[in-house]
C-alpha cells in the first residue's frame, strides 16, 4: 500500500512539474509578445507621400523629409506638438492595447491614407466577402449611411490597429480556420498606393487561403 501511495505521489509531483513548466512557457510567450508589441508600438512613422520636400517641427525638434520618403522615430504615449507651414497642431498618442498590433503615422501634410479590410476566405461569394469585410461607416452613392471595407484617414496623427503597415505587402495566402471559413487582415495604404492596389475597375479583392485548418 505504501509503495502504491509513493508512486501516486511521485506521479502527481511529476504532473505538477510538467504543468508548471507548460504554464511558464505560456507566460514567457505572452510576455515576449507583449514586449515585442510594446516595442513596435513605441515607434511612429513620419511620412511624406507628396512630390515636395517638407520641413516641420515635432515637439520642438526640426525635421526635413524628402519627397516620397518616411522616417521611423520613437514616440512616447501622451501629448505632442507638430508645427508645419505656420500651423501648430497638438495630438495625443494613446497607450497600445494588450497584444495589439498598434501602428501610428505622423502626417504633417494631412495626406490621404486608407485602412482596408483584406478578406481571405474559402468558398465565399463576392456578396458574402463584402458583407463580412464591410465594418467601417461610410455613405453610398446616394449619400445614405452604409458600411464599407475601407476607411479614409487624413489627420495629422493616425493611430490604428493593423496587420500590415505602409510598406508591408499583404500576402497572397494566409491560414484560415475551418470553423470560420475566412479571416480579415487590416492593411494601411497611402492614398496613391491604394488606388494602384485596387486597380481602376476593382471594388474589392478576395484572396485565396492556404492550409485551411
Listing of model-derived features with the role each one plays in the protein:
Residues 77-79:
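Extracellular Ig-like/FN3 beta-sandwich strand-entry sites
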Residues 2-22, 28-67, 74, 85, ...:
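Short loop/turn and low-complexity linker motifs enriched in small/turn-promoting residues
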Amino acid at each position: 500500500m505504501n509503495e502504491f501511495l509513493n508512486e501516486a505521489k511521485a506521479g502527481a509531483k511529476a504532473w505538477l512539474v510538467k504543468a508548471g513548466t507548460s504554464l511558464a512557457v505560456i507566460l514567457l510567450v505572452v510576455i515576449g509578445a507583449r514586449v515585442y508589441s510594446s516595442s513596435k508600438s513605441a515607434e511612429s512613422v513620419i511620412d511624406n507621400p507628396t512630390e515636395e520636400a517638407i520641413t516641420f517641427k515635432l515637439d520642438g525638434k526640426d525635421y526635413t523629409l524628402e519627397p516620397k520618403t518616411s522616417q521611423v522615430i520613437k514616440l512616447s504615449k501622451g501629448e505632442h506638438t507638430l508645427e508645419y507651414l505656420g500651423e501648430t497642431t497638438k495630438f495625443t498618442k494613446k497607450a497600445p492595447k494588450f497584444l495589439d498590433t498598434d501602428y501610428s503615422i505622423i502626417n504633417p501634410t494631412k495626406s490621404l491614407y486608407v485602412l482596408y479590410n483584406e478578406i481571405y476566405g474559402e468558398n465565399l461569394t463576392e456578396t458574402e466577402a463584402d458583407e463580412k469585410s464591410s465594418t467601417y461607416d461610410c455613405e453610398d452613392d446616394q449619400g445614405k449611411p452604409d458600411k464599407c471595407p475601407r476607411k479614409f484617414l487624413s489627420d495629422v496623427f493616425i493611430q490604428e490597429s493593423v496587420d500590415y503597415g505602409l510598406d508591408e505587402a499583404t500576402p497572397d495566402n494566409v491560414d484560415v480556420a475551418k470553423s470560420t471559413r475566412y479571416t480579415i487582415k487590416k492593411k494601411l495604404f497611402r492614398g496613391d498606393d491604394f488606388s494602384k492596389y485596387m486597380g481602376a475597375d476593382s471594388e474589392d479583392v478576395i484572396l485565396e487561403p492556404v492550409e485551411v485548418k
